[in-house]
């Protein structure tokens, strides 16, 4: 069992697969596509909790950058290595700073919500950044309309994937997300919301009756106009305060 998947015990009928997240693409309305626009071409990137390396590989190809991954789970680290990602099988610890050196970007792609102490991790990440460097992170929006609707119905049902992933330890609104980063001594440069067209709710009636291209346009527009209600994930770029 991968270390993080154990936190799903008691909330699902069976444990989520450690390989459940993959198959991302660079759709500009979704989180990985948004992440790619926040990473400068040729940057040196540290992908913390890189998992199977699917996001790392996309970033390497799209941004022509060098990516080093950190992944404590051996099976996921092996999968990332098979994609050509240079992976260190460890957690983010201070002792890695001399080994890995400074980075232009430290990436947390759907990672901070799985941590007991995201504040401490963000503070440590600053030590891996060179001057002018930034953290880029994606996090789920717990104030999404689907969560609000279920709460009105008296339900807070965990799922294997998505906003209600049973292995999440932390929950974020845009306000609590910004508070976390400012308290950790970052200056927020940009925050954008993803459409989340992959969510299960959009795969069933009445949403499935809408042509995919039209639905993508509607969801993207809604996420931009009302991100706190329709944004599935927030993608943030934040620089270290000097």
Regions found by a protein language model. Name each.
Residues 1-105, 119-122, 193-196, 205-206, ...:
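Conserved N-terminal segment of class I S-adenosyl-L-methionine
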Residues 109-114:
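Short catalytic micro-motifs in class I SAM-dependent methyltransferases
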Residues 7, 21, 54, 94, ...:
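S-adenosyl-L-methionine-dependent methyltransferase catalytic module, highlighting the catalytic core
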